[in-house]
């Protein structure tokens, strides 16, 4: 089951999930991509998103406006839907309308092998890594996340040295091996690191939970601001989305 948490009043770009992407609302684009892989449900926090999904025949449920994270919203949706305890749950984003089907499939496969949860990352360049909107991740020898940050990690102390490890940009999608793991994560108290960085995935690392990271090839970009949207519409084309 794929859940897409969709919040109307995003702090940096209000109503962005309803913005037009080549003739379809952004959240509808995201859901159509997800439905190519598995059954998808949008977890809405507002009737306007719910009505938009229904208009385009996208399954949706109405959740509380008061969740602290998309993961918490996913859990409420899972509870409303009555998913079985052993069913895998993927948490995709409502602001990733250009996410490729292949990336979702890679996450699904990684989730099967993850002891707790899985996510994805892609290789990025130094210029991309400078943006605090693009979260970076560093891995251990088993491809588990060591840390996620909006800062540049790993930092290259010797600027003349050749970088020995690629910079990895996090793709904010998550896979949970089963419903119980999702419940376990949401039951943990928020930690200071996630509050500082505003990154919910740091809660899992703080409590020593493993996040398996699958490195993928992706041209997708998350839409955090109006500028992001305008830039993306210049890069992508309707033909590319109708794959």
Curated annotation (Swiss-Prot):
One of its GO terms (molecular function) is 3-deoxy-manno-octulosonate cytidylyltransferase activity. Pathway: Nucleotide-sugar biosynthesis; CMP-3-deoxy-D-manno-octulosonate biosynthesis; CMP-3-deoxy-D-manno-octulosonate from 3-deoxy-D-manno-octulosonate and CTP: step 1/1; Bacterial outer membrane biogenesis; lipopolysaccharide biosynthesis. It is an enzyme of class 2 (transferase). The keyword Repeat does not apply. Its main location: cytoplasm. Keywords: Cytoplasm, Lipopolysaccharide biosynthesis, Nucleotidyltransferase, Transferase. Its EC number is 2.7.7.38. The keyword Aminoacyl-tRNA synthetase does not apply. InterPro entries: Cytidylyl_trans, KdsB, Nucleotide-diphossugar_trans. GO terms for biological process: CMP-keto-3-deoxy-D-manno-octulosonic acid biosynthetic process; lipopolysaccharide biosynthetic process. One of its GO terms (cellular component) is cytosol. It catalyses: 3-deoxy-alpha-D-manno-oct-2-ulosonate + CTP = CMP-3-deoxy-beta-D-manno-octulosonate + diphosphate. It is found in: Cytoplasm. HAMAP family: KdsB (MF_00057). NCBIfam families: kdsB, PRK05450.1-5. Activates KDO (a required 8-carbon sugar) for incorporation into bacterial lipopolysaccharide in Gram-negative bacteria. Belongs to the KdsB family. This is 3-deoxy-manno-octulosonate cytidylyltransferase. It comes from Helicobacter pylori (strain G27).
